[in-house]
Amino acid sequence: MRPASTTAGGVEIETLRVHSDERGSLFEPVDEPALAAQRNVHVVLTWPNAVRGNHYHREAWEVTTVFGPCLVRWRDADGLHDVDVPAGEAWRFRIPPGVAHAYRNTGTTAMVLVSFGSRPHDPSGGDTVSAAIL
């Protein structure tokens, strides 16, 4: 497991404690202080080698937790940043507005991604801007 938390390119990265036994694995995708600020949540299953994201938000912060394996990429003023989340680990990413982000499932089974947004979901895509980076 990597350091418990760090920041890279404006994105806060935190490794989470995963509890596993013969039944499966459990982790908390968002911490209590951040939970109160969230206005929507979605759970995403991503198939092997598929990519999700490829966008940024004009105003919203996004808190995304992935259960690896997964390649997480984001682009900020300093360029592209890549993080490989190992299989069986849960990592949380706090992504500020204006930072493009994307996720690729690098495994052989469905990847779980849980994402929280600081703004309510807008089906018209008002706060979400397409940005192909992966």
Feature locations, PLM:
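Non-catalytic, conserved peripheral segments adjacent to functional cores
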Residues: M1-R92, R104-L134
